[in-house]
Amino acid sequence: HLYRRRQRQMCIRDRYIVGTPIGNLSDLSYRAINVLKNVSQIACEDTRQTAKIMSKYNFKNHLISFNKNNSFQKIPSIIKKLNEGQSFALVSDAGMPSICDPGEDLIKEARSNGLPVICIPGPCAAITALVTSGLPSSKFIFQGFLPKKPSERREILLAISRYENTTIIFESPHRLKKLLYELKEYCGGDREIRVSREL
């Protein structure tokens, strides 16, 4: 009981980013579970996804929807709560927050307000895909999602065609075929490609 009280006290005024499972809910660390149980509130992309984690590990907490559609409206109120001393955890639907999601903007704003953030490491889809690909992994480039605007997309694809290092790209399933055709067009047919999903 004393150990639990000390853990709870550690969370009273802290800000966390917490890595969540990218496919298997059992991949959540003990430390991550403890933080998510004890912070005042959790900001998450989709409350339904985070609710699955809480159900799996039998705890409840106050969830705040924080995603690309509402992040700029939510950031000021979240920073206000943090300045008032409330503890807070930021999670994404899967993997580490701030990689291709609006968590990046929240963390930047927190730090500019003198509110350092503690990272609770967890699974990362990009690194998991890289290390299981069989492609060179000592040096790599993370590209994330490519721009949708045609001119910007062409510019990035041309840059990728010149990269010598392994390049990691995110893409949604329904746009994957188009991306593969584009990569063949810009990079040629002799470039090795690995497709990873359900990591």
Which stretches of residues belong to each language-model region?
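Single conserved hydrophobic/aromatic residue that forms the stacking wall/gate
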Residues: 1-12
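Short glycine-cluster motifs
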Residues: 83-143
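A short, charged helix-loop
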Residues: 141-162
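A contiguous loop/helix-start segment that scaffolds small-molecule binding in enzyme catalytic cores
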Residues: 165-166, 170-199
